[in-house]
Structures are given as structure tokens and as C-alpha cells.
């Protein structure tokens, strides 16, 4: 007996169209256009997950640098001092500390300055 792939094909197409929900124009209801748009969107999503990590690191460094300069240090001198003093705070924590607890950040920066 001949086996047709109607159910599987419909399910596969519906999965793509479901992912394309909210798109404008033919990209939301024309399978071929929707498939192209979804494929591109998934590519961008993969790329931007890596990009987000870089963007946040850059943001943290800018914040730390600004806070370090208020206590008379540059970013590089602060990081070098923290390494010498064996203080294992990462950039995310330092950035949060600079915003939420400036006096605590100043204390850590002074330890780094002394090292």
C-alpha cells in the first residue's frame, strides 16, 4: 500500500507556521516565506546569545571604570590590584556593587589600591 506523508508534512509545516506567529505579511501564513524567516530568526537568536554575553561584559567594565575613577583608580589598575590582593570578585559583582553599594565598592577599591 502506498504511504503518503500528509500528516507528517502538515505537522512539520504547522510547527514552522506556529514559530512564525506574529510576523508581518506573507511571512506569517505562507510556508516557504515563513520557513525562511524562522530560519533567519533562529540564526540571529544563536548569534545574539553569544553577543549578549559580550555586551554585558562591556557594560560591567564601563560601570566599574566609572566607579573606580571616583576613588582615583583606573579600571586596569583596579583589576590588577584585586588580583594582587587575591580578591576573587568578578566583573558582574563589582558592577552591581558599584551601583548598589558605592561605599562597599570604595572599600574594595582602597584594598586594591594598597596592594
Curated annotation (Swiss-Prot):
Role, per record: Binds directly to 23S ribosomal RNA and is necessary for the in vitro assembly process of the 50S ribosomal subunit. It is not involved in the protein synthesizing functions of that subunit.
Molecular-function GO term, any one: structural constituent of ribosome
HAMAP family: Ribosomal_bL20
Cellular-component GO terms for this entry: ribonucleoprotein complex; ribosome
Lineage of the species this protein comes from: Bacteria, Pseudomonadati, Myxococcota, Myxococcia, Myxococcales
Gene Ontology BP, a term: translation
Family, per entry: Belongs to the bacterial ribosomal protein bL20 family.
Name the record gives this protein: Large ribosomal subunit protein bL20
Alphabetical UniProt keywords: Ribonucleoprotein, Ribosomal protein, RNA-binding, rRNA-binding
PANTHER family: 39S RIBOSOMAL PROTEIN L20 (PTHR10986)
Top-level division of the source organism's lineage: Bacteria
Family annotation (Gene3D superfamilies): 6.10.160.10, Ribosomal protein L20 (1.10.1900.20)
InterPro entries (alphabetical): Ribosomal_bL20, RIBOSOMAL_L20_CS, Ribosomal_protein_bL20_C
Xref: CDD domains: Ribosomal_L20 (cd07026)
Amino acid at each position: 500500500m502506498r504511504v503518503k506523508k500528509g500528516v507528517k508534512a502538515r505537522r512539520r509545516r504547522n510547527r514552522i507556521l506556529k514559530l512564525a506567529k506574529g510576523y508581518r505579511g506573507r511571512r506569517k501564513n505562507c510556508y516557504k516565506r515563513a520557513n525562511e524567516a524562522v530560519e533567519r530568526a533562529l540564526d540571529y537568536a544563536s548569534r545574539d546569545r553569544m553577543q549578549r554575553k559580550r555586551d554585558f561584559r562591556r557594560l560591567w567594565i564601563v560601570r566599574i571604570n566609572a566607579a573606580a575613577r571616583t576613588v582615583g583608580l583606573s579600571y586596569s589598575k583596579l583589576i590588577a590590584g584585586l588580583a594582587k590582593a587575591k580578591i576573587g570578585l568578578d566583573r558582574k559583582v563589582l558592577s552591581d556593587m558599584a551601583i548598589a553599594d558605592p561605599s562597599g565598592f570604595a572599600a574594595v577599591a582602597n584594598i586594591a589600591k594598597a596592594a
